[in-house]
């Protein structure tokens, strides 16, 4: 039996629970602790006061970071000495100044380091307005991140094969471990997802509302469409709003978007123009998200750029059928199990057709909802993801002890 590990997770911002990176770190820490390991979270807003960092104020960059509900942590050798004492390995989430100094401190003290690739260059580019169209900017960001941060780290955690392929094409020489961020067990469909195989024959089960149990429009019940994500350009909620405006069943649809961000006013203005019913758009605590998805009939994920799209997994785990934008910059489309769950990114006409189809086929919606819940449970539950993450950490420790690099997928 292998001995438990002491793992330090380094994250710039741990204080904002609308930040997907922070949520992923917290849920991974809980699961790793449940496996018998000791986990320390280090960063701004860390739960243990002795591991809390101060925020670093960087002109312009801090303003952009706050718009993304995050911040930069200030490097501190005293903090690293305290947090890394007796640690077996350090895992760094973000390739900024705090992460780079943590990397250098750990390596200089003989502590193995791994890192995650969670910052998609396109997420940075879409914050730059028209500057995002500068030719070669994406490749330049990938190259810059490699030389600034990742080059010295042998093992990198990548949430999806799509992003691993991007890194390999851009000559990242690290061992890339493709491991989903997973979802928490709080996200469930209200029945045993493991029993969903063959459930197609039981379409009348459960009188209470459950995801995918929508009635036909003539019943008067609103058909609830859920979406979740930052209110930024690359998340493209504007396409979803315009699609609902083009739906035959516009008057039967209620839109709910969980998220905050700089486009709030613009999106609300578009909702008033396009939608027959009042939309709900705003921040939701992560603890409220299982209920948020559980009250919906369909999930739409219009994002143009996503390394993974954990909110899609969470919706699927609750038994929602997703309709996902197909984009070369988004891995979320790989979750689709049927063609009616995909539409070309930015195409509001096709998205409207998909929404109308699911509204008019409630039995298919119910059946596919069960299939999606079972698929998420089988492949993306957090227990499996934490196990694979721990295997990566142990491989990195072995390599640091001189046993040679190992590539994992």
Predicted regions and their residues:
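Donor nucleotide-sugar binding/catalytic pocket of nucleotide-sugar-dependent glycosyltransferases
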Residues: 43, 136-205, 209-211
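Short alpha-helical donor nucleotide-sugar binding micro-motif in glycosyltransferases
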Residues: 84, 150, 283-284, 291-296
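Aromatic "clamp/platform" in nucleotide-sugar-dependent glycosyltransferases that forms part
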Residues: 95, 304
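Conserved donor-binding/catalytic core segment of Leloir-type glycosyltransferases
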Residues: 198-202, 208-209, 215-245, 256
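Nucleotide-activated donor-binding/catalytic signature segment of Leloir-type glycosyltransferases, i.e.
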Residues: 265-284
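Short hydrophobic beta-strand element within catalytic cores of glycosyltransferases
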Residues: 321-325
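Conserved acidic donor-binding segment of nucleotide-sugar-dependent glycosyltransferases
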Residues: 337-349, 357-362
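A charged, aromatic-enriched C-terminal amphipathic alpha-helix characteristic of glycosyltransferases
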Residues: 360-395
